[in-house]
Amino acid sequence: MRVKHKKWADPLIAAHPELMIDDATQFKGKWQSRFAKEQPLHLEVGMGKGQFIIGMAKDHPEINFIGLEIQRTVAAIALKKALEEDLPNLQLICGDGEDLQEYFEDGEVAKMYLNFSDPWPKKRHAKRRLTYKTFLATYQQILQDQGAIELKTDNMGLFEFSLESMNNYGMIFDGVWLDLHHSEENEHNVETEYEQKFAAKGQPIYKLIANFK
């Protein structure tokens, strides 16, 4: 969902280069220098307003997290939230998920998260889905060997497409859940804003974890 651009967003992003990067290409291969200490690097593509990535950074101080968001106002909202926390293991990027190879070196990322991505339901838009084969090829490059992807969605169509696309690509599934919130996997689940909304309506949340051979 597109959010109307707010005038305060750009000045806020510009005022906090220590936390949000506007030109991620300058740190390609050097992301560990942005953190207090060198640790495994996890990336969320499409962080939205930041609830998930901030929650993960709080729960896992032993991991360095990066959240990426293309919409500047949405990214600025996430930045506002992150500024309220003291998280030396969190960095944010205002950037495009299609440019990941320009942002990260091969094998620089240990794990990726795709949460409630745009399902692009029309068949002619299949190539825009973040689990289309061309995106998977990019993820395979920036991820370490056997690097994992975690995906959550409320959209069964996108979930089925992702399962098929990943299977056809030769990925291995470590877990598939058709009702996350009523499974043991939910015990340590960190929710997104969308996830809370959909779950409150009783909609099942689908999740998968897959890795490259």
From Swiss-Prot:
GO cellular-component term (any): tRNA methyltransferase complex
One annotated GO molecular function: tRNA (guanine(46)-N7)-methyltransferase activity
Residues given in the record as substrate binding sites: K122, D154, T192, E193, Y194, E195
Catalysed reactions, as listed in the record: guanosine(46) in tRNA + S-adenosyl-L-methionine = N(7)-methylguanosine(46) in tRNA + S-adenosyl-L-homocysteine
Annotated binding of S-adenosyl-L-methionine, by residue: E44, E69, D96, D118
Its EC number(s): 2.1.1.33
Pathway(s) this gene product operates in, as recorded in its UniProt entry: tRNA modification; N(7)-methylguanine-tRNA biosynthesis
Pfam families according to UniProt: Methyltransf_4
HAMAP family for the chain: tRNA_methyltr_TrmB (MF_01057)
The protein's role, per its UniProt record: Catalyzes the formation of N(7)-methylguanine at position 46 (m7G46) in tRNA.
Family listed: Belongs to the class I-like SAM-binding methyltransferase superfamily. TrmB family.
Protein name listed in UniProt: tRNA (guanine-N(7)-)-methyltransferase
